[in-house]
Amino acid sequence: MYSNNQRSRIGSHTWKIAFLFAFLALLVDGADLMLLSYSLNSIKAEFNLSTVEAGMLGSFTLAGMAIGGIFGGWACDRFGRVRIVVISILTFSILTCGLGLTQSFIQFGVLRFFASLGLGSLYIACNTLMAEYVPTKYRTTVLGTLQAGWTVGYIVATLLAGWLIPDHGWRVLFYVAIIPVLMAVLMHFFVPEPAAWQQSRLAPSKQTETVKTSAFKLIFQDKRNRNMFILWALTAGFLQFGYYGVNNWMPSYLESELGMKFKEMTAYMVGTYTAMILGKILAGFMADKLGRRFTYAFGAIGTAIFLPLIVFYNSPDNILYLLVIFGFLYGIPYGVNATYMTESFPTAIRGTAIGGAYNVGRLGAAIAPATIGFLASGGSIGLGFVVMGAAYFICGVIPALFIKEKQYDPQQS
């Protein structure tokens, strides 16, 4: 139970402190996720893996993130947004560091799965936390900027990989993951739970019953909540099928099929991710001005168009330009996704609903890396990217036709 004293810790600038920690949390989340992509070829060679087995490591990651996100969403509603952010960071930091000690495919896969439980719950907890701190007028701009933290993490991982792997090997890259433990400890002491969540825990009758009743039961008893949950689960499934399939295999595609050397590839990926940051931030401005629905569909369908262009029309002269434009479009759906979803559900079930819908979708997306691995073994990674483009098109059409924006205000309990 939260007291008036705890609620009084929230001042006019508290949301800025919360934003700083949430941004850094998503930065390390994104960096941790990309460590596998850049070390995949080295791990594949050392453990003598097939292409399908290499893809399965990405699928283990997504399966862990899915289960972690579903549980983390429920835990956010039950125990608090900040508390789950802290626990998530501690979980994936310690276990990811342990990946550097593994000696086989099975050891790596099992430990990666458990580390990914923290990766999945962190994304839901951070976005729910900030949605409840930021006023509606600026919410998408702030949350879009927050999503850029993930992409800054990609760049950090890219630079670390280019620096460490060629001279020190892939294991050292994973040892670095222990550093965010310090940040988790500091966040525990400096960031209070948002007022809307605290109030929902103090309110008598209805909110108390919500805590005692299964949140998933509350979601599926209400037709509106049930429909939103199903639509968002479908949208999230296609979004993540495309996003993680491309994210997991793009470095390998540039190396193996376009013939880039490792350091050259990392430079190209930095350019792509820099454009992605811009896409996420501008998506926030666009969504506040033009609407969540339009901006989301524009980014998803634009990405669907550009994936085949990269595969069929790339050349040494234009590949950088194609990757930069692709990176910009690729970032837009995630710049809007958090706000769009959080405004689709009421406070009492928000964490559970978002975590459930997003991560039911992620379970479907867990097959994406292995799917591209299978297609690559019989053809090319590029063929898999075309399939990912089709998934992006569908994920843009569903919300454009069926999901209204601004259904609930996250600042209201």
From Swiss-Prot:
Belongs to the major facilitator superfamily. Aromatic acid:H(+) symporter (AAHS) (TC 2.A.1.15) family. The chain crosses the membrane at residues 17-37, 54-74, 86-106, 113-133, 146-166, 172-192, 229-249, 267-287, 294-314, 319-339, 353-376, 383-403. GO terms for cellular component: plasma membrane. Residues 1-16, 75-85, 134-145, 193-228, 288-293, 340-352, 404-413 are cytoplasmic. Coiled coil: none annotated. One of its GO terms (molecular function) is carboxylic acid transmembrane transporter activity. This is Cis,cis-muconate transport protein. Its main location: membrane. Residues 38-53, 107-112, 167-171, 250-266, 315-318, 377-382 are periplasmic. InterPro entries: MFS, MFS_AAHS, MFS_dom, MFS_trans_sf, Sugar_transporter_CS. It is found in: Cell inner membrane. Keywords: Cell inner membrane, Cell membrane, Membrane, Transmembrane, Transmembrane helix, Transport. Probable uptake of muconate. It comes from the Bacteria. NCBIfam families: 2A0115 (TIGR00895). It is a multi-pass membrane protein.
